[in-house]
């Protein structure tokens, strides 16, 4: 499968803790290097606690702050890239569908040609309920790239799905 290289990109990441906290800087760098419009939305309703400092990508100055906000502000400041964040858990399908709705962009200010964003949903959550929500959104989407990751103490997995033209 080949993806167009001129379409704008939108990445929506659910979860900014153990997995999301380490995935975020790489996503920021990749989007920063693209030669096309890109948006990154980080979503998490959790706050940074002392127990998170040992295994998550946070520092003591982040304690008590929302995880999504910390990551969005940290890396957008470093890379000079505007970022959105949602400081709450995404628990309802309509909310997730709204987040992954592609926006149309003008490709060139001298042309009327427009292109819809290519949307990537990153699941970096630690609960099955949200994974099921992402699965529902994936199957209801006309076009979506969905990458889900999960891990235990000694194991982990990554699953990827691609929908184009309403087909998986």
List each model region and its residues.
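Adenine nucleotide-associated cytosolic modules
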Residues: 1-168
């Amino acid at each position: 499968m080949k993806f167009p290289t001129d379409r704008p990109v939108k990445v929506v990441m659910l979860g900014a803790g153990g997995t999301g906290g380490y995935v975020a800087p790489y996503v920021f760098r990749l989007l920063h290097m693209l030669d096309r419009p890109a948006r990154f939305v980080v979503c998490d309703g959790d706050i940074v606690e002392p127990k998170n400092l040992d295994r998550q990508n946070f520092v003591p100055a982040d304690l008590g702050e929302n995880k999504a906000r910390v990551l969005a502000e940290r890396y957008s400041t470093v890379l000079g890239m505007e970022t959105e964040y949602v400081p709450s858990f995404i628990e309802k399908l309509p909310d997730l569908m709204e987040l992954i709705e592609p926006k149309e962009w003008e490709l060139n200010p001298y042309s009327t040609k427009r292109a819809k964003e290519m949307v990537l949903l990153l699941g970096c959550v630690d609960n099955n309920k949200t994974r099921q929500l992402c699965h529902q959104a994936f199957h209801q989407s006309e076009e979506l790239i969905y990458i889900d990751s999960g891990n235990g103490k000694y194991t982990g997995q990554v699953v990827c799905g691609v929908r184009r033209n309403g087909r998986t």
